[in-house]
Regions:
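Conserved beta-strand scaffold positions in the cores of enzyme catalytic domains, especially
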Residues: 43-48, 120-122, 223
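Extracellular/periplasmic periplasmic-binding protein-like sensory domains
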Residues: 87-163, 237-242
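Extracellular/periplasmic catalytic domains that process cell-envelope and extracellular macromolecules
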Residues: 9-10, 64-66, 89-91, 112-116, ...
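Buried hydrophobic packing segments
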Residues: 2, 6, 167-175
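Segments of small-molecule ligand-sensing domains
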Residues: 149-162, 172-233
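Short hydrophobic alpha-helix segments
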Residues: 46-47, 235-237
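Short amphipathic alpha-helical coupling segments at ligand-binding clamshell hinges
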Residues: 139-143, 167, 182-190
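Extracellular/periplasmic Venus flytrap/periplasmic-binding protein
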Residues: 1-91, 133-134, 138
Length: 244
């Protein structure tokens, strides 16, 4: 997604990436390289960090020194907060893209300081429970009502809560498709047979699809920019599948 966006909007970008040294971080880095294709030389620096590191400041300093004008942060919430603060503290002004796993307003951007997060880009597939633009959305109204009734101690602005509700709806759909045949084989077969399923919490245009040879239900995201105290989506829903 990010590679596709940069190729279209900033084809001369010099990209630096910070990622956690685990399978997810390495997969994201590989996906970026694959997405850039023959333009992979746009990636000028990449640094991994260990989850046990108390601070990632030294990595940010190294990435800035690379001459990069575009910074992609594929980090956990704690490190994302540190990265946003450090970039602002150094006066570095790259095009800043924050991985969606740590794009929560409540747990990342607010602790990092809204003033430091202005203009940061990300991409996501779900509606933000903290964003008033969804207050009259029928799907989100059902989500809010569910929380009020069954989980009043949970925050609708918590990205993991939004994710959990949508994932639970997808599981209900799988079990509904399975009918009375709740064997493991049939449940797995139905999980690999989702067709254009739309949970209440996904952005308009995003649909869940799986097949026997494609187990990734969500392969679409929409770019968004942080403005004021909320995310503002822009542009079309983008497919992350290579070749599309």
């Amino acid at each position: 997604i990010y590679a596709r966006y940069l190729l279209a909007e900033k084809p001369g970008a010099k990209i630096a990436v910070l990622y956690q040294n685990d399978d997810l971080g390495r997969d994201v880095l590989k996906g970026l390289k694959d997405g850039l294709g023959d333009k992979a030389t746009m990636l000028v620096a990449a640094e991994s960090y260990e989850v046990t590191e108390p601070t990632i400041d030294s990595h940010i300093i190294n990435l800035k020194a690379s001459g990069a004008d575009t910074f992609i942060s594929v980090t956990t919430p704690k490190s994302a907060v540190q990265a946003i603060r450090k970039v602002a503290e150094m006066g570095w002004k790259p095009l800043f893209i924050q991985g969606y796993a740590s794009a929560s307003i409540a747990s990342v951007l607010k602790p990092a300081g809204f003033e430091n997060a202005q203009g940061i880009l990300s991409a996501y597939y779900a509606k933000d429970g903290a964003d008033p633009q969804w207050d009259r959305d029928p799907g989100m109204q059902r989500f809010y009502a569910f929380l009020a009734k069954f989980a009043p101690d949970k925050s609708r602005s918590d990205i993991s809560v939004v994710y959990g509700y949508g994932a639970a709806q997808a599981m209900v759909q799988v079990l509904t498709q399975a009918g009375d045949d709740l064997t493991r084989a049939n449940v797995m077969r139905q999980a690999a047979s989702l067709k254009n399923f739309v949970p209440d919490t996904v952005l308009p245009g995003v649909k869940l699809n799986t097949s026997a040879d494609d187990f990734y239900p969500i392969e679409q995201l929409q770019m968004m920019r942080f403005e004021g105290e909320r995310w503002v989506t822009f542009g079309p829903v983008i497919s992350g599948e290579i070749g599309r």
